[in-house]
From Swiss-Prot:
Domain PLA2c stretches: 74-615
Sugar attachment sites: 72, 125, 191, 194, 272, 301, 374, 404, 409, 481, 516, 545, 574
Gene Ontology molecular function: lysophospholipase activity; phospholipase A2 activity
Gene Ontology biological process terms in this record: glycerophospholipid catabolic process
EC number: 3.1.1.5
Disulphide-bridged cysteine pairs: none
UniProt protein name: Probable lysophospholipase 4
Catalytic activity: a 1-acyl-sn-glycero-3-phosphocholine + H2O = sn-glycerol 3-phosphocholine + a fatty acid + H(+)
PROSITE patterns for this protein: PLA2C
Protein biosynthesis is among the record's keywords: no
Pfam families membership: PLA2_B
């Protein structure tokens, strides 16, 4: 991993000005410099940078037309909170209603293409046809790019043939958290464009957010100056700023196709884009976790918050209520703004994606276990991180819309009652690194979920099923007392079984029998938990198990991960696997309508469904090897088939840089999902 010294130091400089009040620490502003400066392109050390930063500007500072600052508007309704008991938001329901005919048409086309022998008029019809959701896990750039490869496999716009082509267009919902939120958010906010365009024109993968202009010192300084000015706009408007503001503005420049990452572009503004107005693609949802001020770790029953184009809120615990997305940032008392005015522009697209990915903040707070006290940067990093932790700046603060709010379930306490702000953190910090939760609510009637798992599990960075185990445990533990509102979940085995049986070496189906789930042995209906299709990251053609904190990729790495994910998702373009996915998609519809299972599907379920077997011995350490060529029609179980590379993922050079920097110990110290 490579992070430029100059970029990192400037990042810390700006963070210091945010963390410390005037008078405690004086850090001069970073100025623009003339392009003809003698320092242009030089790899100067940080002491020179600090001297440069104190100079007078050679040019007038660049201006920003759009402001990052939230502002006041007249509220459209006195009571802004919508109770979850009302079901779906009216706007979301309208979107889904408009999309039903398009989804059914795409599903019919896909199923017909597979040759599955089924009566489509009975299985795919009206609003009771199959509903597909696709969930993209967290995991930094690894998750964004690996998820992008799976996205390509499902997308009919992708230039390479895929037997799964059209499944993206067949989906009703798409969700993402952390690195997966970068994928979902970047696609959605850029008019639901395709991955190839984003990779080539927007993501700028070859350069880190610390130094997006490589070794060009002048441009990097201008970049940080722009970040500083944008955050100052929000701060001067009277709003608390956190490290997430800085992170979000930096991320925006890699994810939003607009000048300086669109400081005035909001997440809710996607409603104005043509794809959204036409309901052409799945409805996007971004996920974050809540953390109370006194908590240092995320409890298993934390409230999971979701961001959609129409609203922000949670279906969980003592809240179960939503505020319109365009009014996020408005402080409410019992659902009403005290001064009859609302905040607008707080739902900045970059800030939302940064909120779902505050894991970056967490790694900074773990630095002190790894940086030596005699290091050049010890004092300055120690000072900023100590202050950030003390002031809860390792989170994303949102003005609290839930003060004095009581739901109809008075037996459950509103945990956010005492606080002026709600603190949100990375959506994977509760161990549920795949955003399945929004797709389990009964109001959305999702029949099947594709879970794209790019999680980094120890020891070698491949997913071991920990995320789906965590979701299963949350459902079993908390659904019974009605503190959460989901339909249940398929039974999921322990991680040892997942590894021992090779369930993480290929796509695996869970919950194939709708009568055998945590919801109990009942006739299958719209309240039955969805069937889960688990797609783990696996080395078909490339070692894609790079660190979560990898900040840049060259073309070889990016293309390698994209291709590997495509091959893993399609099972080497296996048309038989496409038939089995069609079976998974229609299974709940067949069960609900009491239709017989096609013979082809029975064979598929024998091959891909977990049959309830539990491992009785301890699994070996999971360290798969990459295939030098994809020569088989399906992924191996336990060991690779075909011609295998002799290099294991634990030693692969392409995923581990040979040139190490002092900060690498920080990034590698606590490899989270």
């Amino acid at each position: 991993m490579y992070v430029n010294y100059i970029g990192l130091f400037a990042f810390v400089q700006i963070s210091l000005t945010l963390a410390y009040p005037p008078g405690r620490v004086e850090i001069s502003e970073i100025y623009d410099f003339e392009e003809s400066s003698s320092y242009k392109g030089q790899d100067i050390d940080t002491s020179v940078l600090y001297t440069l930063s104190k100079r007078k500007p050679a040019l007038v500072k660049r201006s920003t037309d759009a402001s990052y600052a939230p502002f006041n508007v007249t509220c459209s309704n006195d009571n802004l909170l919508r109770p979850a008991s009302e079901g779906l938001n009216e706007g979301e329901q309208s979107y889904i209603n408009k999309r039903i005919s398009k989804v059914n048409s795409e599903l019919r086309s896909f199923i017909s293409k597979t040759g599955l022998n089924v009566d489509l008029d009975k299985v795919v019809n009206s609003s009771d046809g199959p509903r597909l959701g696709i969930a993209f896990s967290g995991g930094g750039l690894r998750a964004m790019v690996n998820g992008g490869g799976a996205f390509n496999a499902f997308d009919s716009r992708f230039e390479s043939d895929s037997p799964l082509s059209g499944l993206l267009q067949s989906a009703m919902y798409i969700s993402g958290l952390s690195g997966g939120s970068w994928l979902v958010g970047s696609v959605a906010i850029n008019n639901f464009t395709n991955i190839t365009y984003l990779r080539d024109n927007v993501w700028n993968l070859e350069h880190s957010v610390f130094a997006p202009h490589g070794d060009n010192v002048i441009e990097n300084l201008n970049y940080y100056n722009d970040l500083r000015k944008e955050i100052d706009q929000k701060k001067h408007a009277g709003f608390d700023c956190s490290l997430t503001d800085l992170w979000g503005r930096a991320l925006s420049r890699k994810l939003v196709d607009a000048e300086r990452g669109g400081p005035g572009i909001t997440y809710s503004s996607m409603r104005n884009q043509s794809w959204f107005q036409n309901a052409d693609y799945p409805y996007p949802i971004i996920v974050a976790d809540s953390r109370l001020e006194e908590e240092t770790a995320i409890p298993a029953n934390t409230s999971i918050f979701e961001f959609t184009a129409y609203e922000f809120g949670t279906w969980d615990n003592g809240i179960k209520a939503f505020i319109p997305m365009e009014y996020v940032g408005t402080h409410l008392l019992d659902g009403v703004p005290p001064d009859k005015s609302c905040i607008h522009n707080y739902d900045n697209a970059g800030f939302v994606m940064g909120t779902s990915a505050t894991l970056f903040n967490s790694f900074l707070l773990d630095w002190n276990e790894n940086v030596k006290k005699n290091d050049t940067y010890y004092d300055i990093l120690h000072a900023i991180l100590e202050d950030l932790s003390k002031h809860q700046d390792d989170i994303a603060p949102y003005p609290n819309p839930y003060q004095n709010y009581t739901t109809s379930n008075t037996s459950v306490v509103n945990a956010f009652e005492p606080y002026d702000t709600i603190d949100l953190v990375d959506g994977g910090e509760d161990r549920e690194n795949i955003p399945l939760w929004p797709l389990l609510h009964p109001q959305r009637f999702v029949d099947v979920v594709f879970a794209i798992d790019s999680t980094y599990n120890d020891p070698y960075g491949w997913p071991l099923g920990s995320s789906i185990v965590a979701t299963y445990e949350r459902v079993v533990t908390f659904n019974a007392n009605k503190s959460v509102d989901v339909r249940g979940f398929p039974y999921i085995p322990d991680e040892n079984t997942i590894i021992s049986l090779g369930l993480n070496t290929r796509p695996t189906f869970f919950g194939c029998d709708g009568k055998n789930t945590t919801a109990g042995n009942h006739d299958v209906d719209n309240n039955t938990p969805p069937l889960l299709v688990y797609f783990p990251n696996y080395p078909w053609t490339y070692y894609s198990n790079i660190s979560t904190f990898t900040m840049s990729m060259d073309d070889k790495m990016a293309n390698g991960i994209l291709e590997n994910a495509f091959m893993s998702t399609t099972q080497n373009n296996n048309e038989s696997f496409a038939v089995c996915l069609a079976c998974a998609i229609i299974q709940r519809s067949l069960e609900r309508k009491k239709l017989s299972t096609p013979t082809q599907c029975s064979s598929c379920f024998q091959e891909y469904c977990w049959d309830g077997t539990l491992a009785t011995s301890t699994a070996s350490v999971y360290d798969p090897t990459v295939m030098s060529a994809a020569t088989t029609s399906r992924a191996p179980s336990g060991t690779t088939s075909g011609t295998a590379s002799s290099t294991t993922s634990s030693s692969v050079a392409s995923a581990t840089p040979t040139h190490k920097h002092w900060w690498d110990s920080i990034f590698e110290a606590k490899e989270n999902p």
